[in-house]
Amino acid sequence: MAVQQNKKSPSKRGMHRSHNALALPGIAVEPTSGEVHLRHHISPNGFYRGRQVLKPKSEA
C-alpha cells in the first residue's frame, strides 16, 4: 500500500484540490424566442444563432 513520505502542507493540499471545483453548464438565451439552451446547441424550438435550422414538431 502506498504511504506518503512527508506530510502535505495545507497550501499544497489546497493546490491539489484546486481542480476539483464543479463547473456550471454553459447556458445561453436564444435572442429570437428567449428560450434557454446549452451553448452551441439548438434551442428547443429549432433556432440556432438567431436562424431557424429545424422546423418544430407541430403540437397536435
UniProtKB/Swiss-Prot annotation:
One of its GO terms (molecular function) is structural constituent of ribosome. It comes from the Bacteria. Residues 1-28, 41-60 are annotated as: Disordered. The keyword Ribosomal protein applies. GO terms for cellular component: large ribosomal subunit. Pfam families: Ribosomal_L32p. Residues 9-19 have a biased composition (Basic residues). Keywords: Ribonucleoprotein, Ribosomal protein. GO terms for biological process: translation. Belongs to the bacterial ribosomal protein bL32 family. HAMAP family: Ribosomal_bL32. This is Large ribosomal subunit protein bL32. It comes from Verminephrobacter eiseniae (strain EF01-2). The lineage of its organism: Bacteria, Pseudomonadati, Pseudomonadota, Betaproteobacteria, Burkholderiales.
